[in-house]
């Protein structure tokens, strides 16, 4: 796992990249508990089951949209930005890799025809005018 911290405010986690070939444990929580967008990687064997459950409704306050891309097919070049809007890192994601942006900006260049990604972000989505600002 690659964690990208701010050069402007060291100690602030901006972005994270996890590669498919790094999965080794049965369960790994790969995001710090204080982030709004949470992710665990589960490596499971045939026959594994879970107890049926549902999640508790509770009010939570979020102050930023955090986003993740999972590459399903193809490849993507990620440009990650620091909190001062300067590029801090460039990373290429291949099939089954993922990126997470907690703070700072990002941009993506699609490298292969018919690339497919899943995009996850914290909600609720209130429209583009309340979600992002261009760098």
Predicted regions located by residue number:
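Conserved hydrophobic/aromatic beta-strand scaffold that supports enzyme active sites
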Residues: 41-43, 68, 90, 98-100, ...
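A short, N-terminal "cap"/entry segment at the start of jelly-roll beta-barrel domains
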Residues: 1-42, 91
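Double-stranded beta-helix
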Residues: 4, 8, 107-135
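Short beta-strand His + acidic residue motifs that chelate non-heme Fe in jelly-roll/DSBH
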Residues: 52, 78-80, 100-101, 106-112, ...
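Conserved short histidine dyad/triad with adjacent acidic residue
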Residues: 23, 41-63
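Glycine- and acidic-residue-biased ligand/ion/polar-headgroup-sensing regions
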Residues: 45-46, 64-81
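Short acidic-glycine-tyrosine-enriched beta hairpin
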Residues: 82-103
